[in-house]
Amino acid sequence: MTAALTGRADARGTMRPRTLACTADGIWLWPGTPLTERRGAALVPLPTPHLYQHVATLHGPAVHAAALARVIERAAACLDRGRLEEADRVLAAVLLPPVSFDGAALMQAIGRRLGVSVPDVEIAGWPSASPPALFEQLARVHDRKLAVALTLEPIFNPDLQRIAPANVPFDPLVHPRWPAGQPDGGQFRPRDGDAIVPVQWQGPAVRVAARFLARLWRLLRRLPKLPEPREPEPPPPRSEPAPPEPPARAPESGEEKPPGVGHNRPPEDGAGPTPDEVENSPVPGNPGAGHDQPFTLPVERPTGEGEVAQWGQRAADKIREALKNNDTKRLTEIADALAHADWIKEQLDNIIAAQDPPRSLDELIEAAQEGGRRFGYDNHHIIEQGPQNGDVPPNVIDAPYNLARIPRYKHWQINKYYGQPQSECEGLTPREYLKGKSVEQRYQFGLAVLRKFGVLK
Amino acid sequence: MTSRNYSEMSDEELAKAFVEISVSEADAIGLGKVRTMRKLFDQLRALKETLRARGPEARRVLVPFLSYSPPSASIFADQAAQVRLNAARELLAVVPEQARAALEDLAANGPSAQSGRAGMCLQFLEDGVFKPT
């Protein structure tokens, strides 16, 4: 048994490979998951349930959430005072269980995918029945962290620092590198002003999210079933209920993805479904369906990106309905379903942001002007970008009053609405319907859409 | 299913096809398949025109769909809501009060995609832009 298990700090202290590290800008979990957020000048730890959720992904459910939160808080306080080395020492002494076998498998998959070194940390436990392909799928969630992961790599793997000048702490935010796969991959790149600002927990969704995640947290903290003493096959399966059928409809190849950030553009025209597609489209018999049936999610990740987002939006709708009805039983059931589907976790920010109540236009506009990222939110152009509004002056499209920060799922819904023919638009899409209308009419239409989709008061 | 064989179908068969297309439409919306949404809209329009061509009473076959709520294990909430939404839009001139009530209920309580669409439909009605026939 080693230091990690007994709680004794490793003799190498901050120079040992590890999964927690800090820079002047925050505290990070390998490969680059932020555990703090910046509020003004202060660094604030993420809420304890979220800290636990992140760290337990690698270290297993035995992570002591309260102790972890205390250490992160102490380290963040050190960073606030500019004491980077002291913060590093605090983190190095954190009592974490060894990385679980599943955590290690996930780390290997992430390392391969991002091209970063995996810290040589202690591993303990026993393998689960999860297929290797599952870890490859889960690793995709970390793709967006590539640049951060590359810059933090020498901190999580101190041996790599030997190539740096002696006694000079490596600061990835001062010396960022271009990510692998680019022509200059691995080379230092200029600093940019778009620092990562993980602020998932700001905004009106906080109260709802806190309630929701408090339930999710308790479910996630349930210890996995251990093997019976005399059972020859020890590893228990990670997910328990019989896998429901996949969603009603499998995605087609070349499937369109839900619209992303800042697009607000009309889709390209092209071939639609064949008659067979329509004939074979969703039919009764879908598990997880309906309002008085238990809410379930597929155990395995659905094969298409569009499907993952679709499940996420269904979950968001169910949560909103349960919150509206103050149905705690339903909420617990949904949290349980989410806790057992690892693949949906990449959607949690979107699901929580979708619970935002309508806000005033000033709030939406001000939020868009704040800059930085908000996980679960997008900036939405009230008069859309794109050729359909090519006759609108660019200074109007880009004006602050035309840009609102809204929950990502709502953004996607609105964009899909704009691209779908509507009976009330004489069979035209709203984009087509608005052509030739005045700028003021288009803006008012955009506001009406925001109101009706529950974004604007 | 194509518009070509709608004319050969009974009202009840058309009603069944109406549900199938609406359910597919809900999925196309959920999956962000914009081209599919357009195709399904065209199919639904052809179906509705077939019903309309059979006289004012034929459309009443859609009235039960204003409160469409099949056995819950068989369908997702957004799929059922899309059936209600499409039926309500088509029945505004036939059973205006019932259809409007369905739209208002969807706008207030429906899944986000259908809620927004129902709300916008009501907005077009209030503005006098949409005149159901």
Residue positions per predicted region:
Chain B
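Amphipathic alpha-helical scaffolding segments comprising HEAT/armadillo-like alpha-solenoid repeats
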Residues: 2-6, 12-15, 53-75, 96-108, ...
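HEAT-repeat alpha-solenoid elements in large eukaryotic scaffold proteins
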Residues: 16-45, 77
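Hydrophobic core/packing positions within alpha-helical solenoid repeats
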Residues: 33, 37, 43-51, 91, ...
